[in-house]
């Protein structure tokens, strides 16, 4: 069993164990299984001889849970990513496409609910503290094993749905196969917006997140990292309700991701630079089943 498969099993088991008690203690909960597909993904350092990026097709299967409880909310997402042969396993041309598992856990504690005091101020409906972690593994030539802790304040805005603005501190490390021990980057900041908003009375929703992440000092090979921009958003149609099924069960739609200086790798051409592969503009199709 290869590393991504072992990690997928471990993360899947963790997600199941984490989701079950959260759902049991929840005021409300939503779990979804989704599939998305696009043909214009990119990876740092994966470039053609002329310096242009290699377009990679990926199929991504995700398990997601969002839960609200007495004092706040939690978010769990596990992505299982399968690349085509343009992003080969082991970084070896001709091998089957690489596999990646990326897990995210966040919890936001609403300080107003904890203290019993109203913290509403104009368009701000609440103030919270967000904490959590990211982790991943991938079996390409780099063989990422990212681990990252996250903490910071969050403003929750008054909108139909939700819109949260956070200022976060990231404590990140990685242990790719080319180095002997885990490398810790300089602690760095991120400014993030997360939203899920219905569109009037239409069976449509607009969801996503946007991040701007500061540089994190030198990477494990001594190169300077760069600030990172990452936007991922989707427009989803409640197809199930239109077909006479339960509302918000089967959703179909389109998704768009823009990622500049992916994972802090600078989009620039030259020796030891990531080239155009460090930036991608990726349209996708997406299907979700909620249960």
Task: Name every feature range the model reports, one short phrase each.
Residues 1-28:
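Cleavable N-terminal export/targeting peptides
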Residues 23-30, 66-75, 111-128, 156-165, ...:
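Short loop/turn motifs that connect adjacent beta-strands in outer-membrane beta-barrel proteins
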Residues 172-249, 291:
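Outer-membrane beta-barrel transmembrane domain signature
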């Amino acid at each position: 069993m290869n590393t991504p498969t072992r990690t997928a099993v471990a993360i899947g088991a963790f997600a199941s164990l984490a989701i079950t008690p959260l759902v049991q203690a929840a005021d409300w909960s939503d779990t979804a299984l989704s599939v998305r597909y696009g043909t214009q993904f990119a990876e740092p350092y994966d470039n053609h001889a002329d310096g242009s990026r290699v377009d990679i097709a990926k199929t991504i299967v995700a398990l997601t849970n969002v839960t609200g409880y007495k004092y706040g909310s939690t978010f769990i997402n596990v992505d299982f990513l399968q690349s085509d042969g343009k992003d080969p396993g082991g970084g070896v041309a001709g091998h089957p496409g690489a596999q990646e598992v990326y897990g995210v856990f966040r919890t936001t504690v609403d300080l107003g609910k904890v203290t019993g005091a109203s913290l509403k101020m104009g368009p701000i409906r609440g103030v919270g503290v967000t904490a959590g972690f990211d982790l991943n593994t991938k079996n390409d030539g780099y063989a990422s094993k990212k681990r990252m802790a996250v903490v910071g304040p969050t403003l929750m805005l008054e909108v139909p749905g939700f819109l949260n603005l956070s200022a976060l501190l990231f404590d990140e490390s990685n242990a790719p196969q080319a180095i002997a021990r885990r490398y810790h980057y300089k602690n760095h900041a991120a400014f993030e917006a997360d939203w899920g908003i219905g569109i009037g009375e239409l069976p449509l929703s607009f969801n996503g997140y946007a991040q701007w992440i500061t540089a994190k000092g030198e990477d494990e090979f001594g190169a300077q990292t760069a600030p990172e921009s990452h936007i991922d958003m989707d427009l989803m149609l409640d197809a199930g309700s239109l077909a006479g099924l339960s509302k918000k069960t089967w959703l179909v739609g389109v998704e768009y991701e823009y990622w500049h200086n992916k994972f802090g790798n600078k989009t620039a051409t030259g020796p030891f630079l990531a080239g155009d592969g460090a930036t991608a503009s990726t349209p996708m199709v997406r299907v979700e089943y909620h249960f």
